[in-house]
């Protein structure tokens, strides 16, 4: 269904009484679903649906201007995949001024934007980019159908380091078919990313066979 047909809980004001501008960071989205079909993830089993330009503009302005939040998180599973939307949001946040924002990207982040676009995102307030790395083993990445190369994460880490933007990298262990060599490659990639940027945030997760995924189709 069209996301614009669903009333925004922000714009309807139903969440206002729960907001604490000093301690909370609001989450918004420009789309739902994911065009990729990673074997462990249920998000890819849903069709993608995008909000129209004017809808997410209203929400961003409401949160950052009307409620005066200083931070914003874009929770789209692959927010940075659509450069036109990302740059549109960056321009809006830059116009509002003195705000910070973050979002989730794929490993291919480093080759999806020009150097000028990267710099503008940083100027507009981009402070952190989150990656679901999952594994440092190319064999495992291929089995997961991640459609990304191990080296992509290294190059993205270098781009973020040069921009002065935080990198948040999540790894997943105990996947089906994972062996000791795969595990060692994941640990090695963690060390490489840490060497590139000592301030990187690393998260370790244990595989959970979610329903409606390739790993658990029930």
Regions found by a protein language model. Give the residues of each.
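Generic recognition of well-ordered alpha-helical segments
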Residues: 156-159, 189, 206
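Basic phosphate/pyrophosphate-binding loop/patch that engages nucleotide-derived ligands
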Residues: 191-197
């Amino acid at each position: 269904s069209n996301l614009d047909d669903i009333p925004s809980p922000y714009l309807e004001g139903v969440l206002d009484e729960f907001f604490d501008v000093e301690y909370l960071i609001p989450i918004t989205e420009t789309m739902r679903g994911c065009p990729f079909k990673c074997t462990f993830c249920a998000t890819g089993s849903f069709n993608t649906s995008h909000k129209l330009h004017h809808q997410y503009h209203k929400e961003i302005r409401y949160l950052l201007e009307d409620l005066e939040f200083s931070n914003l998180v874009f929770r789209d599973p692959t927010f940075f995949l659509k450069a036109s939307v990302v740059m549109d949001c960056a321009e809006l946040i830059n116009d509002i001024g003195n705000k910070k924002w973050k979002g989730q990207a794929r490993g291919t982040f480093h080759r999806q934007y020009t150097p000028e676009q990267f710099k503008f995102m940083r100027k507009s307030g981009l402070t952190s980019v989150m990656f679901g790395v999952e594994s440092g083993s190319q064999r495992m990445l291929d089995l997961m159908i991640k459609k990304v190369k191990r080296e992509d994460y290294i190059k993205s880490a270098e781009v973020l380091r040069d921009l002065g933007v935080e990198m948040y990298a999540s790894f997943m262990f105990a996947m089906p078919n994972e062996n000791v060599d795969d595990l060692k490659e994941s640990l090695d990639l963690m060390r490489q990313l840490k060497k590139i940027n000592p301030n990187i945030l690393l998260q370790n997760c244990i595989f959970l066979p979610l329903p409606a995924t390739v790993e658990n189709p029930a």
